[in-house]
Curated annotation (Swiss-Prot):
Source species taxonomy: Eukaryota, Rhodophyta, Florideophyceae, Rhodymeniophycidae, Ceramiales
Entry keyword set: 4Fe-4S, Chloroplast, Electron transport, Iron, Iron-sulfur, Membrane, Metal-binding, Oxidoreductase, Photosynthesis, Photosystem I, Plastid, Repeat, Thylakoid, Transport
Coiled coil region boundaries: none
Name of the protein: Photosystem I iron-sulfur center
Cysteine disulfide partners in this protein: none
Membrane topology of the entry: Peripheral membrane protein
Underlying gene: psaC
């Protein structure tokens, strides 16, 4: 099941999210103006299972990578309030 994965400009290029993803959804790409010279990218969102391990691994206070779950997935994971 595909989910929307967004990488924000606050990404510091640490690769933690890429290494945490069990489905190889994320990869690092070159980025000018970034201190690390690279930033995370999500070219394979159709493979995202919504586990949010990438979010958990992100060391920034801004959660530079976010996974947005669809309504059905949110309900099935018991995340509705």
């Amino acid at each position: 099941m595909a989910h929307s994965v967004k990488v924000y400009d606050t990404c510091i290029g640490c690769t933690q999210c890429v290494r945490a993803c069990p489905c190889d959804v994320l990869e690092m790409v070159p980025r000018d103006g970034c201190k690390a010279g690279q930033i995370a990218s999500a070219p394979r969102t159709e493979d995202c299972i919504g586990c949010k391990r990438c979010e958990t691994a992100c060391p920034t206070d801004f959660l530079s990578v976010r996974v947005y779950l669809g309504g059905e997935t949110t309900r099935s994971m018991g995340l509705t309030y």
